[in-house]
Amino acid sequence: MGKVVVMDHPLIQHKIGIMRRTDTGSKDFRTLVSEVAMLECYEATRDLELTDVEIETPICKATVKELKGKKLAVVPILRAGLGMVEGMLELIPAAKVGHIGMYRDPETAEPIEYYCKLPADCANREVFVVDPMLATGGSAVAALDMLKKRGVKNIHFMCIIAAPEGVKRLTEAHPDVDVYIGALDDHLNEHKYIVPGLGDAGDRIFGTK
């Protein structure tokens, strides 16, 4: 059974607060997205397995802990998810990166897939799917469906801001997936935007409208 973790770290909350401001420009917004992703990655990798390894320090031989050879992958949901990749790779630089491309139909608010490129051995990796916003949950559910159809079993989902509606939909569709959230907001408005939210994350990351 997966777990839902809402981050309460002061640094995460502070940075998200700055991201929400309308006067935060794209350059600063991009930096904040990357920094929050790195902080969330720290928490999301807490349960990675360790193994004992014998090494030699400048003083003597010693037994130290190292990651137990688990292969990792980061899979952003395009396009906004790209903003979280650099922060993730700061902590797990050996991870492979896949990409899932989706956009939200303006009429139905449901996701439409247009691209999928994953590491060849993705089924054997522990996969972290990243997207700054979890609104309706449609794109997240569809992305996890795609991964599972390709044999991926060990999946985590990470977002910066989520709506309760999206969390409910995601956890009901994929109850085995751990979900990591920077901030859980109030609700979705009539246009399916998160309230209070921070606007369109993709537009704010890339300076588009």
Swiss-Prot record:
Coiled coil: none annotated. One of its GO terms (molecular function) is uracil phosphoribosyltransferase activity. Gene3D superfamilies: 3.40.50.2020. InterPro entries: PRibTrfase_dom, PRTase-like, Upp_B, UPRTase/APRTase, Ura_phspho_trans. It holds the Pfam family UPRTase. Its cofactor is Mg(2+). Keywords: Allosteric enzyme, Glycosyltransferase, GTP-binding, Magnesium, Nucleotide-binding, Transferase. PANTHER family: ADENINE PHOSPHORIBOSYLTRANSFERASE, URACIL PHOSPHORIBOSYLTRANSFERASE, CHLOROPLASTIC. This is Uracil phosphoribosyltransferase. It comes from Agathobacter rectalis (strain ATCC 33656 / DSM 3377 / JCM 17463 / KCTC 5835 / VPI 0990).
